[in-house]
Amino acid sequence: MDTGLCVPLRGISGLLLLLCALPWAEGAKVLVLPMEGSQWLSMRDVVRELHARGHQTVVLASEVTVHIKGEDFFTLKTYAFPYTKEEYQQEILSDIEKTFKTQHFVKAFFETTASIRNFFDLYSNSCIALLHNKMLIQQLNSSFFDVILTDPIFPCGAVLAKYLQIPAVFILRSLSCGIEYEATQCPNPSSYIPNLLTRLSDHMDFLQRVQNMLYYLVLKYICRLSITPYESLASELLQREVSLVEVLSHASVWLFRGDFVLDYPRPIMPNMVFIGGINCVTKKPLSQEFEAYVNASGEHGIVVFSLGSMVSEIPEKKAMEIAEALGRIPQTVLWRYTGTRPSNLAKNTILVKWLPQNDLLGHPKTRAFITHSGSHGIYEGICNGVPMVMMPLFGDQMDNAKRMETRGAGVTLNVLEMTADDLENALKTVINNKSYKENIMRLSSLHKDRPIEPLDLAVFWVEYVMRHKGAPHLRPAAHDLTWYQYHSLDVIGFLLAIVLTVVFIVFKCCAYGCRKCFGGKGRVKKSHKSKTH
């Protein structure tokens, strides 16, 4: 009997092939230990996408967290922190306030060193509070997570992954002393790869290479002081002596928030993946408020001004200098600022507590971007093709600014020393000199010419690690070598010993031959002369 449900055999075969071609997916469990600030924004996008693909995500943060809030696409777990929320915020803000103080180089260096140590002390105490919470650790251990996603600048996640024997994926911009290259066994020659905080390019003269080497040694010393608490904690948990390099080398994949449009070309390892621009999302329509600001700017357009999520207030004197400079340009300026309103603020400058930075940068009327040179802001500027005036404040921001300036896509100002004239001239330069717009558009084109979006690439590698229970096949054998084996010093010594031995034997043979040939004649002549006498 014909029921009308007959399907041609060819159709069934096609359906089966289609089903077989679909990627096999099973919801996995992801534990996330994020870092505060803009670092969380990138990780948050990855977490959201993992949730959309059916994975369960638990985000572990301290109870005094400032930026990490509970959302519907992950479960937020908090742990006790040895500071109150007010003390925690004060610790962070006090270091930021120091960036606006003019100091002698030596004093600034020691204060920066102290700030780095305070930063590590703050988070190492947080790590101790977390890892000594036996009940929480037992809960995490019994939850059978498939992967830990963490930023190794807060090494607690790496220590926890090593302790629980869970595959780890790191997402980061960089670490303070190049320890990421030791942990991945990635070559890092100081001859053409500038170290963090040096503000050097990849083309260095002799004195700059000396400076680069000295910076490396100083950062190594600071790092040694700063990471000791984590090494002690890891050794206590694992019940054996362990270095932080060994703990970090446990990572299956390293996701670096950079690419070679911004960063200088360098060697990489198989488990190093570059996801620069992961925060560049599709431009959304502006709200009525901001659309009105943009439309009112007329033919001159707008300038977007933001110093990032960590800085929204600056000293009054400096704010007035900035306000004076902004009032001299014809563009409308949208300035994210929550401090006291400068008394000389011009009519063309609008203060806002928050602004949709990426959406504004993507608007065709945006002429320039004043930024602190954080990697998120830099990449949003690159993605949207907006030339920049950069005011780096701390950390890798100086290096990011140097890279963009080297590529002719922006102008860098020293926020401590600049005057209103300096800022005015910088803005007019990047707006009126067409080469800056052309260079940033070229960088934007290079950055966007890729086979896969950075967010999809990041999620792929997280799922890859979960599917295969890690990625040990990407781990180089260099991890198993001693320092002298890595540099082949034992081989060089062995070959040198052979060469020296051969040279010694040849020398002895020649000396023996000479004695036989010439020494005998000399004795005969001497004997003959004696007989004559």
UniProtKB/Swiss-Prot annotation:
Sites where a glycan is attached: 141, 295, 433
Membrane topology: Single-pass membrane protein
Tissue: Expressed in kidney.
Domain of life: Eukaryota
InterPro entries, alphabetized: UDP-glycosyltransferase, UDP_glucos_trans, UDP_glycos_trans_CS
TM segment ranges: 491-511
Keywords, in A-Z order: Endoplasmic reticulum, Glycoprotein, Glycosyltransferase, Membrane, Microsome, Signal, Transferase, Transmembrane, Transmembrane helix
Catalytic reaction(s) noted: glucuronate acceptor + UDP-alpha-D-glucuronate = acceptor beta-D-glucuronoside + UDP + H(+)
EC identifiers of the protein: 2.4.1.17
Any one Pfam family match given in the protein's UniProt record, by short name: UDPGT
Main location, first listed in the record: other
Enzyme class: transferase
Signal sequence residues: 1-27
Molecular function terms, GO-annotated: glucuronosyltransferase activity
Subcellular location: Microsome; Endoplasmic reticulum membrane
GO CC annotations on file: endoplasmic reticulum membrane
Main function: UDPGT is of major importance in the conjugation and subsequent elimination of potentially toxic xenobiotics and endogenous compounds.
Family: Belongs to the UDP-glycosyltransferase family.
Entry protein name: UDP-glucuronosyltransferase 1-2
Species in which this protein is naturally found: Mus musculus
Name of encoding gene: Ugt1a2
